[in-house]
Each structure stands twice: as C-alpha cells, then as structure tokens.
C-alpha cells in the first residue's frame, strides 16, 4: 500500500506490465501517453510522484482519467463524457500513435470539459448522472463510432446550470451510489434505471432539494466495497457500502457524513484496499486524487474539427 498524505487516498489500482501504456485524459479533452516503466519504481510504502510533473499540462488542465492499455486492439473503444452532456466513442486503435505533446481526443465546445473516460467493447449500457439528480441509461450502440476530431453527440439534455458529474459503464451486478453536497446519499439497484434513447432528460436518480443539495458524485459499487467521502474543508471519511440504505430512485437518501453549514461534500469514490496484492510478474500502478498543476509547453494541435450531432 502506498504511504499517502492525510488529504489523499488511492482510488484506483492497475496491474500492468512495464511496457504497457497509460493513457492520461485531461479536462481539456487531450490525451497523453506514459509507459509504465517511466513511472518511478519504489517500495510499497513510497508516496510516488505527482502525475502532473510527468506530463506537459497547460495551466489549469487536470488529469481526469487514466486508462491502462496493453494492446490497441480492434473491437475496443474509448468512451468519453463531458460536463455539458456530450458523449463520444472512438476506436481504441486511434490512440496507438503516441505524441510527446499529447493529442486532442475530443473537440470541446467553450465552457465544457471532459469528466471521465472508460474503455468498452461497444456492447455495454452507459449511464450519465447530473448535478440535478437526473440519470439516463442508454445502449452504447446508440453512439456511433467517431474519429478523434469529432465533437461527439448529445448524451443527456441538461437545463441551465446543470452539469454531468458521472459517467458509469453499467455492471448489472452492481448498485448505483449517489451522494449530494450536504452529505446525503443512497444506493439504488441498477435495474431501477430502465434503458432509454440517448439525448433525453433522463429520470430522477435521487431527489435534490435544499435539504440535501446538488449531486456531487455517482458511482457503481458492490456490496463489499468501501468508499471515501471528501469535503471541501478537507475532511475525509471512509465507510463501508453495505451500511448505506438501498432505496428507490425517487428518494433523497440518508446522511452519509455530517457536514458543517460552512462545508460541503465535494467528491466520493471507491477505495482500493491496502491489502490488495500485486500480481506476479506485473507492477501495480496506483492512481490517487490527482493534483492540479501547470506546465510550460502547449499541446499538439489536432488536424481539423468536426461538428457534433444532437
């Protein structure tokens, strides 16, 4: 387990070989490449190196997703979602030619940013969760495959002031855990979210009110998972998922964490257990809460743009 700072935690652990790639997707819609062997090798108790110091990020650019890739195979896709409700699916093979300065993975409109990226097989169900508590579940096949320069298509219709806060690739065995800024949350069965066509307004995933506040996160969890709750003031609370109520969609949830009136919940995530062991012949790559940072070099300019669809 990594010896981490008091205000940080491990939320993802990848088992990777030294020659595997790490695709680092940023809020600006760019992707950068790292080889696993480029990461500093250290003992189990070492803190590691901030990823922002290893990539030529622009001022304010954040790494929002890291995908480990062993082979760039046909039939696999990179699925992306933005805060303004745009989604895009691009063949993984289109990310097989690394550039030191990075490339554009998604052409973003003004005031939009990339929130998350996942690798899929093209046959999964996708869920988007908004800050207003709305959730939409649709077939991944509803999103046609596009090149890197395309702007994507509408995944969910949002009202003014609303943002997509979570992209989830559905696992039928899991449950959806949603949490709000005033410390409330709940679990809901995946089957309670019926698939519909992409681009709609979705259904109520959790009731939002002055009492519980806007949604700050939604993740898929198993009954034996643990999660970390992070407040704006820096409070971290670790809790077991099986102690959180499983209720229907149209409810507000229960108290997950006691929040001071001047504080807010800002993030939730699954926590990787410190007892997880490395696989033989492979390295464990840990991704914690990534820090914001700046770099001097500008990224590569992609060739042309394509208008998005609705």
Residue ranges and their predicted role:
Residues 1-310:
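Short, structured "edge-of-domain" segments at secondary-structure transitions
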């Amino acid at each position: 387990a990594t010896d981490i700072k008091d205000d940080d935690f491990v939320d993802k652990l990848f088992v990777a070989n030294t020659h595997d790639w790490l695709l680092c997707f940023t809020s600006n819609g760019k992707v950068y490449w790292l080889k696993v062997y480029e990461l500093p090798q250290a003992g189990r108790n070492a803190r590691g190196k901030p990823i922002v110091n290893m990539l030529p990020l622009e001022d304010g650019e954040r790494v929002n997703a890291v995908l480990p890739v062993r082979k760039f195979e046909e039939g696999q896709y990179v699925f992306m979602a933005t805060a303004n409700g745009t989604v895009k699916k691009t063949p993984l093979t289109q990310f097989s030619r690394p550039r030191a300065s990075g490339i554009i993975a998604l052409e973003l409109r003004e005031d939009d940013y990339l929130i998350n990226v996942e690798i899929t097989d093209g046959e999964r169900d996708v869920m988007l969760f908004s800050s207003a508590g709305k959730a939409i579940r649709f077939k991944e096949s509803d999103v046609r495959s596009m090149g890197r320069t395309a702007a994507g298509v509408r995944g969910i219709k949002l009202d003014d002031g609303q943002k997509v806060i979570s992209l989830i690739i559905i696992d039928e065995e899991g449950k959806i855990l949603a949490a709000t800024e005033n410390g409330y949350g709940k679990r809901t069965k995946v089957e309670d979210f019926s698939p519909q066509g992409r681009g709609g307004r979705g259904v109520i995933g959790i009731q939002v009110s002055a009492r519980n506040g806007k949604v700050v996160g939604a993740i898929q969890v198993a009954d034996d998972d643990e999660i970390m709750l992070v407040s704006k003031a820096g409070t971290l609370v670790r809790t077991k998922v099986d102690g959180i109520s499983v209720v229907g969609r149209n409810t507000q949830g229960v108290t997950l964490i006691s929040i001071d009136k001047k504080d807010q919940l800002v993030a939730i995530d699954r926590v990787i257990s410190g007892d997880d062991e490395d696989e033989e012949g492979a390295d464990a790559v840990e991704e914690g809460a990534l820090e914001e940072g700046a770099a001097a070099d500008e990224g590569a300019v992609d060739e042309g743009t394509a208008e998005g669809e609705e």
